């Protein structure tokens, strides 16, 4: 077996054990034993790190847990809109256990793809992006709306959000992205797609490549064609929902 294959198998086994640990927050060992079809003692040894499953068993465990721990259902339960029709993401970005599951989902979705940086716009996408960058073992880059004192050079992208007359700038330190970087753009929600397009242009200005985009929620579908116009990277959305009409301000 090649070293690369052994490392890949080891990462998959560890990822499966992490998913099993997450499942322990929802199910008892007895329940998991019945669901997975393995003795409680075996599952306990996996969770405690005493032993790792074989790759075949890890794949079976992973597939089974993915079926019962449907991430989109958990996200759907946390969807909130205020009286004016604005999306409230508080229950998404503050739930670290949910974000850990989303990280697991993202790792599976982009398995085998080269990723050297994770890029997010401040601020709501940062919790998910930070956890995902840590799991992937790559650098985290944050695009901010203000220039930071102490940073000499920036890559700047200006965009105008739809239905507004406001110009928004995003700044990334020029040395944060390098030529040849493979960048995963991460956010909690994709709504109009304009933030993701601005981030894509920042990556392009750095002569790097957008490997993909990942978000917990996709609002409507208008953003899809907009993003496709600037990049043909894969876009992974956990839950797609329709937009709620905004209340008119009298």
Regions found by a protein language model. Name each.
Residues 2-4, 9-12, 201-250:
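PRPP-dependent phosphoribosyltransferase catalytic core
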Residues 138-183:
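Short, glycine/charge-rich flexible loops or terminal/linker lids adjacent to PRPP-binding catalytic cores
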Residues 6-26, 30-31, 47-114:
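Active-site-facing substrate-recognition patch
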Residues 34:
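Alpha-helical residues within the helix-turn-helix
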Residues 185-205, 209-211:
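Active-site/ligand-binding-proximal alpha/beta "capping" segment
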Residues 115-122:
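Short glycine-rich phosphate-binding loop at a beta-alpha junction
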């Amino acid at each position: 077996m090649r070293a690369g294959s052994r490392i890949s198998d080891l990462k998959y086994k560890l990822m499966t054990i992490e998913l099993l640990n997450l499942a322990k927050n929802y199910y008892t060992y007895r329940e998991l034993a019945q669901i997975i079809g393995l003795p409680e003692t075996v599952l306990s040894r996996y969770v405690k790190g005493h032993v790792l499953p074989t790759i075949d068993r890890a794949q079976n465990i992973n597939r089974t847990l993915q079926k019962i721990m449907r991430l989109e259902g958990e996200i759907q339960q946390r969807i909130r809109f205020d009286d004016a029709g604005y999306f409230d993401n508080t229950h998404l970005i503050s739930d670290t256990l949910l974000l850990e599951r989303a990280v697991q989902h993202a790792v599976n979705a982009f398995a085998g793809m080269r990723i050297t940086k994770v890029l997010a716009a401040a601020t709501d996408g940062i919790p998910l992006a930070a956890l995902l960058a840590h799991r992937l073992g790559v650098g985290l880059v944050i695009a901010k709306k203000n220039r930071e004192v102490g940073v000499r050079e920036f890559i700047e992208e200006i965009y105008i959000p739809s239905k507004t007359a406001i110009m928004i700038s995003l700044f990334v330190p020029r040395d944060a992205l390098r030529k040849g970087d493979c960048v995963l753009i991460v956010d909690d929600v994709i709504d109009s797609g304009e933030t993701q397009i601005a981030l894509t242009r920042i990556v392009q200005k750095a002569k790097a490549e957008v490997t993909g985009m990942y978000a917990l929620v996709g609002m409507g579908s208008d953003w899809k064609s907009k993003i496709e116009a600037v990049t043909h990277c894969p876009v992974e959305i956990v839950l797609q929902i329709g937009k709620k009409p905004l209340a008119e301000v009298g």
